[in-house]
Amino acid sequence: MPERAARLRPDAHAAVSNNKDFNDMKGHAVWASMVPTAVLLAGWSELASAATFDGARLSALWGLPFAGMLLSIAVFPLIAPAFWHHHFGKISAAWALALLGPFALWFGIDLALAKLVHAMLDEYIPFIVLLTALYTVAGGICVRGNLHGTPRLNTAILALGTLLASVMGTTGAAMLLIRPLLRANDNRRHVVHVVVFFIFLVANVGGSLSPLGDPPLFLGFLEGVSFFWTTKHLALPMLFVSGVLLAAFYALDSYYFHQREEERSRFFDPTPDSSFGGIDGKINFVFLAAVVALVLMSGLWRPQIAFDVFGTQVALQNAVRDVALIGVTLLSLASTPRAARAANDFNWAPIQEVAKLFAGIFVTIVPVITMLRAGESGAFAGLVHLVNDSSGHPRDIMYFWATGLLSSFLDNAPTYLVFFNLAGGDAQTLMTTGATTLAAISAGAVFMGANTYIGNAPNFMVKAIAQSRGVPMPSFFAYLGWSGAVLLPLFIVTGWLFF
């Protein structure tokens, strides 16, 4: 017993030390979130020129909370993962308050409340309700059986997931297939590349053909882009990128399997191969069809009825869609056998993280979008000049790369909104005379969300599930090496061919 106690003492000291570091980090984060507020107040005379909330007169300082929010998402999980895990919701709220406080002081509480309600009702709630519905429905579909992870099977699963991603969302398709894929390959030593290409294809590229596929495209749908517009205009770029990636994956997986693992796979298998055992929770396929129908309904049904909520016009079709999606979510939870969700290790942590972080993003992005709508008259005139030529015409290739690179390191949903508005923000114009520009923005946001773990919400969710199953996933920068070697050359060719 004394020896055991002695062994525990260093751990106890370490725990005290770690707790001190944790509290120090918490204090630093609180102070960091106050910096933009202090800067905004310090620049009060400059901000005073924007009392009417005119995008052409707003100072770029109003974009600091948005920048801080996105930098927190990028940096905190790397430098303080434990702190981030416990406090990401508080950090998101702090950045939102860092904007709303000065905003209410200068523009008035009424306008601050109106902008907050608009951000929540017009964009955030529809966005998170759809994601939650897809996540819940997909989490209730359990594929039974342990297949043998050969290159042919793995490629087939990736191809299937790529197609499903535009129907049930990248989140839904990823959550449906990642666990069967990991079980099929748990007898192999080299599995990292399987998960990396799964993120490339299923969690990102595959979601480019419909508003259901990826959050940026759903935001575009909310802005007025028709449901099947992306299906028509992104089909060729998507087929090209996914075809090249599937061929590259098959070649790499064949090398690992036949040269290094074929013998091992015969003798070591934690989950012995078995035939396809059927699907539990089949009722969720009905719910999935209902989700698709509801989104289509909200885009096609125009009753010209709206409700005024603190100045925000909530269209009847959108209210019906969101309430019905909540109903579908509850029905899925009530009717799915518990065993099916248990077999999928279903839990709410991933969607809770997305909900808390995007609440802060949608609040802090309000002044940024207002300034971008001002075009050359606003604070971001330099960005306008980068993506447009001297005569004001868009450089489509620059829209593709600018949207894509920012989507890689920030988040592709708000980045899409930024460049959508930078291109004019009018869906009807962009779908017609500006079709190539809108296609470049859409492809950049969806495709290049695969460049990093933080580019798209499902990326981190897939990484976490793989790590929980014992896969030694690459670090942030190691994953960046994978995407730099595989995706960057492919995107250079894609931009040259299509934009």
Which residue ranges define each predicted feature?
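N-terminal secretory/membrane targeting signals
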Residues: 21-50
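Transmembrane alpha-helix boundary signature
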Residues: 47-49, 81-82, 100-120, 132-149, ...
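Interfacial loop-to-helix junctions that mark the boundaries of transmembrane helices
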Residues: 51-62, 83-91, 113-125, 227-237, ...
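Hydrophobic mid-bilayer segments of alpha-helices in multi-pass membrane transport proteins
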Residues: 62-73, 87-103, 124-133, 159, ...
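Membrane-interfacial helix-loop connectors
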Residues: 101-104, 165, 175-190, 194-195, ...
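Juxtamembrane and boundary regions of transmembrane helices in multi-pass small-molecule transporters
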Residues: 209-210, 229-273, 447-499
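Core mid-bundle transmembrane helix pairs that form the ion/substrate translocation pathway
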Residues: 230-335, 495-497
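Transmembrane helical segments that form the transport core of multi-pass membrane transport proteins
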Residues: 288-418
